[in-house]
């Protein structure tokens, strides 16, 4: 089989189907791309964690229907280098050969097509459920909240993003760290993997989101290609799915009258200095607030940060891991933040960092 297709839509199609961040050795199928060619269509299938994707392109095929499985990232990278108006994909016993003008490039197959077939997303039967995708909201989650996602499997539910109505929570129970924003877009409360966030961020503006039972389908239609991707969230009713979202959301409402307004850039500078001069691998800093302002201190650094507002006069001291505290302040979209004490049973147990876009709760370390 030889299949000829326009290069520009092929580049767009591979960019949609193959998301670099979603290719991982931990999900072996993600390293594969399945190419199927008929006399009229080229179909590109990929899989990643809880995601099935498919793109169909029109073109001209010569020969019998052919299927092959090759390296996904290698295929995407090679296609991106092609500059001719058209490219021909020749299916061989060993994989494929891309022919561009007088040049050709051989890509070996990774598996025989009769050994494995990648899953395809379901077709859309109900157009009435279509909604626009606000990519900026998903981009906000990726850029400002995903940093807090747990990486340890000790509490696997916190490796996901919780979203319900407009609320979005991302956090790590082990580090007593949680973030909250109101950029959610899905109707049902559910848990999303970082792979799903990457998918939604990568979509073009014309993409639509469809509800398919407990799953969702993202679709894009153009004159040159049709794209669909189906993803399955995790739900709190499932095993390991309890995020304790109600409890966490309750923590996100501190007494803001007791907050101190400070320049986050000054906090980051002080933390960088503390990390630079740290004399121990197990390094903590003392975070002290009083009616004069904020002080960040350890055995070698003593940095004072003046407040941007009239301080409430409340005083408290907490210990933090400087790297985690730095990640919290860095994640805030705005440089000026309000920091409030987190009070539980009349005891200060952490801080709540607030700007106009999000709220972050970070628990202090035990002495």
PLM feature spans:
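Structural preference for solvent-exposed beta-strand-turn elements
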Residues: 1-367
